[in-house]
Amino acid sequence: MTPEIGAAAIRDFRDTFAAVRSEVGRVVIGHEPAIEAILTAFFAGGHVLIEGVPGIGKTLMVRSLADALSLSFSRLQFTVDLMPADVTGTRVIEEGGDGRRSFVFVPGPVFAHVLLADEINRATPKTQSALLEAMAEQQVTVAGTTHPLPAPFFVLATLNPIEMEGTYQLPEAQLDRFVFKVRLAYPSQAELERILASTTVADPPTTAPVLEPATAASRALELRRLVREVVVTPQVERYAATIVRLTAPTEAADDLVRRWVAHGASPRGGQALLLGAKVRALLDGRPHVTPDDVDAVAHASLAHRLVLRFAAEADGADPHRVIDAALAGARRSRG
């Protein structure tokens, strides 16, 4: 039985989350829902897939997040000629003071707390798989030797939705490794005016660290452990499992789901659903998850995991309608 989380620990989590969100928001204008979703995924211990057109602030957002958390940051531009060694690192021959030569491992960009994998779908499947091992195992293997990655390790991969030529579709196994998928909307008129005003001056705003640099990594891991301690009752577990099941084309699913969906969300999707809900519970000041917490993260955690049929594409299907149908069915079954 997990002991109930104290009020002081919940307050500390909320204050830290709010401070980081506010600090990122000082530099990144707009995108408040996306910033909150990305922070939620970070404290849930997962990775995020970001979709947005070029120039909308993806790199600035991720770099500002790393700065606010006082964590190391690395950016890797994925291209068709990028090799796995360009991601993970490689061994090089080095000559010592005694004249002897030996192989030395030179870490790649993946050896950072926060990694921005820009336009990940431009790399070949072989290179994508190198990042997949890092995301799944928190380690990389080079020349038969395993190297652990820094902890926490947080990948934010971007997709450009308007340039599909020369890209490689992400396999379902890799999509399933992302806790959330977040879409960045185009800024409003007022937001665009603020962006232009704040970024064309001599001293544009910068992000100040919220966590102490010396203890930032251990502090982030401590807050992630706190999320795991949030209580989920059997009733809420059943509700979350029902939502996941109703995204698959089973007899219990909605007609729309059976027509559009080839494969529903995986059990890993259910794990992401509950972990995101646990963060939401803490942000609401509670040590336990409610169905409303689950509902709040259902779209971000499940929609990108669905494999749709050709009929869905012909109908111009939106996977978020499938999630809406699953949520409606789960609410009915709950009574």
Give the label of every model feature segment.
Residues 53, 87, 158:
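P-loop (Walker A) phosphate-binding loop of NTP-binding proteins
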Residues 198-289, 314:
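AAA+ P-loop NTPase domains with strong preference for DNA replication initiators
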Residues 94-98, 123-127, 135-215, 221-229, ...:
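Canonical AAA+ ATPase core
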Residues 52, 118-119, 130:
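Walker B catalytic acidic pair
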Residues 37-40, 94-116:
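Conserved alpha-helical scaffold flanking the Walker A/P-loop in AAA+ ATPase domains
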Residues 42-80:
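Walker A/P-loop
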Residues 10-56:
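Pre-Walker A (pre-P-loop) alpha-helix and adjacent loop at the N terminus of AAA/AAA+ ATPase modules
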Residues 2-4, 11, 249-335:
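C-terminal engagement/docking regions of AAA+ P-loop ATPases
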